[in-house]
Amino acid sequence: MMIDPSKKYRPFPPVALADRTWPSATITKAPIWCAVDLRDGNQALVEPMGADRKVRMFQLLCELGYKEIEVGFPSASQTDFDFLRQLIERDMIPADVTIQVLTQAREDLISRTFQALEGASSAIVHLYNSTSTLQRRVVFALDRAGITDLAVRGAEMVREGAAKASASTKLRFQYSPESFTGTELDYAVEICEAVMGVFEPTAEAPLILNLPSTVEMATPNVYADQIEWFCRALPHRDRVLISLHPHNDRGTAVAAAELALMAGADRIEGTLFGNGERTGNVDLVTLGMNMFTQGIDPGIDFSNIDHIREIAEECNRLPVHPRHPYAGDLVFTAFSGSHQDAINKGLHAMEKTNQDVWEVPYLPIDPKDIGRSYEAVIRVNSQSGKGGVAHILERDYGIRMPRGLQVEFSKVVQAITDTTGEEITSRGLWKTFEETYLGAGSPYSFLEHHTRPDPAGKDQRILTATVKAGGKVRDIDGRGTGPIEALVDALRKDSGLAITIEDYEEHTLRPGSDAQAVAFIKASLPDGRAHYGVGIDANFVVASLKAVLCAANHLSDK
């Protein structure tokens, strides 16, 4: 039995911001992105990346277009130090990419950080210390003044180290009041202002103030309120870039980041697919693709999402969930019958109108935009309906079933999937269609036919069809204005099966002079029973005659 949560947990206090403006704001451009897979992401892995995996991840991030990449904590890890030296000494950092390194406010760590950066063309030195009320009390046993002193002394040491560094390295600075969301807002402004006093940023050379939701503690709107409150209260706002670093403890990191952008932030730190401590960092792929679907260029190349996922899984040794937004195996897949029908109609409408704007029910994005095909969009199981079955047969085999046949055949498929409890593949669907319609050879199996004018009737023809029935080959004869009517007459004379043709459709299976034709016949009996028949042949007439016999065979069996 669950405990009473009111006895153990307290609600997060709201931010006093009655005149908040972010709810009416709109995201119109991508932020500055900083990928932290090689630090925040790596430290959360069961098996942290070795040198080869780190290089592969770094190369992927560069290929995608990330221009700021946090590469590690070189002063705290020999592995990170060696990796950074490898990137620099082997000239592996593109000219337009700035690396970022993390350091705490300790002289020995800061000195080691600058050693690691020797020879880099450009870098961001990221200084941080925790400022939350909880950590001040429990971890550091320091008051506000003591924590501010740590930050200021750290900033001074970073600036001194920068003064001694090679002039060939273009340095920028970043400060994070770690656990920002658990810090009193007035104190967050106070400590950041103190650090600004050391770095003396300008509008041309701004300081990055990174405001982490180190542990997600409230609903996304609260983070947005905190960011807007901070941006308003901070002096010289034009001299800083406000950076976000959301975590996903409550499952709303993406929403928190988006609302905080609306509240005035300029930059976001995150990881591919949200890898990171506990429930992860904010997912840069989802954030970027969310913007893409709103017509905003994220500035990142997600055109081959499966390749991105493959490398991320290889480097992190963690799978991406099948339902992960945009990248999961099943995110564009519909099993539901009503969804499949709507998607099928939407794709047909797009093809017919040839419009530029994407509008397909249940598909917020064209899968082709991220390197996916339509093949996995519709799959068939016991929850599926006629729309999904029809879509797959048309997409993979060129069969455009009439609506009535869609209903009829979907019942056959439903019976199979209900029995097996499993998905039926495209190949399995085609096999079932063949067995149900194209292989329905009892009692009649078509072999050949010929027609001739009927001397006894104007506009009438006599058809002789050679069929195999009961294991024997024989001819059946009938009269009619055309081959179909004549074959119906022949069946009535031969077996007494009095069918009426209710509907007839035909089309070619593919363009070209050698294309095969497919014919669909709906036939009924006087007692109201009806069934479809299907025939395929290089000749339209033969295809239609095969379809008549197929329907007759089904009605004979009933």
Curated annotation (Swiss-Prot):
Mg(2+) binds at D40, H245, H247, N281. NCBIfam families: leuA_yeast (TIGR00970), PRK03739.1 (NF002991). Its EC number is 2.3.3.13. Catalyzes the condensation of the acetyl group of acetyl-CoA with 3-methyl-2-oxobutanoate (2-ketoisovalerate) to form 3-carboxy-3-hydroxy-4-methylpentanoate (2-isopropylmalate). It is an enzyme of class 2 (transferase). Gene3D superfamilies: 3.30.160.270, Aldolase class I (3.20.20.70). Belongs to the alpha-IPM synthase/homocitrate synthase family. LeuA type 2 subfamily. GO terms for molecular function: 2-isopropylmalate synthase activity; acetyl-CoA C-acetyltransferase activity; magnesium ion binding. This is 2-isopropylmalate synthase. Keywords: Amino-acid biosynthesis, Branched-chain amino acid biosynthesis, Cytoplasm, Leucine biosynthesis, Magnesium, Metal-binding, Transferase. One of its GO terms (cellular component) is cytoplasm. One of its GO terms (biological process) is L-leucine biosynthetic process. The keyword Transferase applies. It is found in: Cytoplasm. InterPro entries: 2-isopropylmalate_synth_dimer, AIPM/Hcit_synth_CS, Aldolase_TIM, IPM_Synthase, LeuA-like_post-cat, LeuA_allosteric_dom_sf, LeuA_N_DRE-TIM, PYR_CT. Homodimer. The keyword ATP-binding does not apply. It catalyses: 3-methyl-2-oxobutanoate + acetyl-CoA + H2O = (2S)-2-isopropylmalate + CoA + H(+). Pathway: Amino-acid biosynthesis; L-leucine biosynthesis; L-leucine from 3-methyl-2-oxobutanoate: step 1/4. It comes from the Bacteria.
